[in-house]
From Swiss-Prot:
NCBIfam families: metG (TIGR00398), metG_C_term (TIGR00399), PRK00133.1 (NF001100). It catalyses: tRNA(Met) + L-methionine + ATP = L-methionyl-tRNA(Met) + AMP + diphosphate. Its EC number is 6.1.1.10. Gene3D superfamilies: HUPs, Isoleucyl-tRNA Synthetase, Domain 1, Methionyl-tRNA synthetase, Zn-domain, Nucleic acid-binding proteins. This is Methionine--tRNA ligase. Residues 584-685 form the tRNA-binding domain.
Amino acid sequence: MRKILVTNALPYANGPIHMGHLLGYIQADIWVRAMRAMGHDVTYVCADDAHGTAIMLRAEANGISPEKQIANVQQEHIRDFDGFGVHFDHYDSTHSAENKVRSEDIYLKNREAGNIAVRPITQLFDPEKQMFLSDRFIKGTCPKCKAEDQYGDACEVCGTTYNATELLNPRSTLSGATPVEKSSDHYFFKLPNFGEYLQKWTRDEGRLPVSIANKLDEWFEAGLADWDISRDAPYFGFEIPDAPNKYFYVWVDAPIGYMSSFENYIKAKRPELNFDDYWKKDSQNEVYHFIGKDIVYFHALFWPAMLEGANYRTPSGLFVNGFLTVNGQKMSKSRGTFIKAETYLQHLNPEYLRYYFASKLSDKVEDSDLNLDDFVQKVNSDLVGKVVNIASRCAKFINSSFNNTLSANCAEPELVQSFIDAGDSIAQAYEAREFSAAIREIMALADKANQYIDEKKPWALAKQEGQEQQVHNVCSVGINLFRQLAIYLSPVLPTLAAQVQAFLQLESFDFASRQQILLAHEIAQFQPLMQRVDPKAVAAMVDASKDSLAATAEAPKAEKKKEKKVEKKPEPKVGEAEIIGIEDFIKVDLRVALVQEAATVEGSDKLLQLTLDVGEAEPRNVFSGIREFYQPEDLKGKLVVMVANLAPRKMRFGISNGMVLAAGNGDGVWVISPDSGAKPGDKVS
């Protein structure tokens, strides 16, 4: 029996759980249930990520303390997770005494080991709010392309990265005030100290998906930098030891919350467990983190480095999921597809969504699409039309004609045994997180069971004199096949599994219990197990999501100081731009590129991520600020012109290796495309 600790990425205590969040939590819960069904000792913990400026400001806007803010949100999160059957053994908060102690311990051990540096940095300071501003609370004009309304770290139009102090016409998004530069001592974690260690760690077998390890190579090639782990007061979080008015950056104590949540679980519920058995350096137990692909950088670089520096064990593996789209597009409040967990639960059975997600998920880091029409069709066809239908077709005969008791003989031992044997490959698929493969195999078995019943036609046999035993045998085989399917689906559909277990009056419903065929076994009266998805309920859920947005928009808002208006600079007219010589122009290497792939960028309303064939051995990754004007599918297969010798730019979404040329006049943007006949890699001159 393996001993395993599983965690999920911590939801931020600043808002509700929505469909995009649930993809990763349902994936982890299914895996935990499957591993337990195979007989392993699995502990599953999580917590709210409860620190940071955003929470402090949200509490201020709501007129409550940060402590009250995070307590309220935590109860909402617990309610929503419970509603979807995501059953944590313990759900904590990073704002706990245990997390404070553990965070200080890891920091002090790293400080003692020489992994902490202190040096002054110059930041932008809001004179009205009397606080330093992080990049997300600063907007201004890009110093490179002069695009307005850009954040303090990178331009989403031209892709340039910069320091917030380089922004033109900067303004605080909190007060509208013009920030001033101010110096402050900050604390840094020396990540470069762990460069060689991390390069090996990220390539350890089973540690990371290969695609993620390949992506991290870009960071190693660019060179790791010291990580700023401090924030200045005012800030809601833990104060750094021996550093008054300096606080741990939220991404320091957030992953440490995995440890403190487990620690609190031991104290509250399982004192027989030992914390060190899971977290000491030489621990043989397993620790896995289920996370979204947007937070890989923190979990695959900073987190293992901090643990290594403090002499703790590192995670056995990171299981990474992609993003969720709805109907093929980014979730949208205006379209009603930005669906909160609470809204879904008011309209639909949560097990519908668990099944649909499972049918889509694999061990690959791929985005998943919740197509609402396909959702209705798949659930109704698979769960109601195939699986539940087997019990419905057979149980009525057992209940009405055979005193609720199955036949003492198995009429189809080879057929039933084939279902039992299939459990091995299904279990392997679950363990490998190949849920879609497991579902496909289970549904193939369901088809086989229905085919058997269709061929034997117990309803017709029941009308023939002297065929009672045959009816009894056929329906008993059908119930045994149904039981196997329900066991295999139990990690995905725990509520349905509990109902089936009660209906079949079984003490155990784990994978091992499937080996025993039910003979002369008494069952309960059959009750309907699952209703069909009503398309009207889906439509009502979408409408309610629109309604909740409208209600939010119309709700009274806290008064804010009017932002200072920044005058928009007109684009220079033809002939007014700075004159350059031919020696400057010929430095620019313009090449024809073919768009192989195009995708939206999570967290950006302006960027598209393009994979470009430039006639080189490997394709180029380029971020382009054209999302408002092009759909990804419009660009795939299109020839464009790019600047091929632009220095790589590290952005918060990844590294951009070039710039796609486009024309614009304020009313739109048009990507420049060569005539047909041009080939990827051709030089433009």
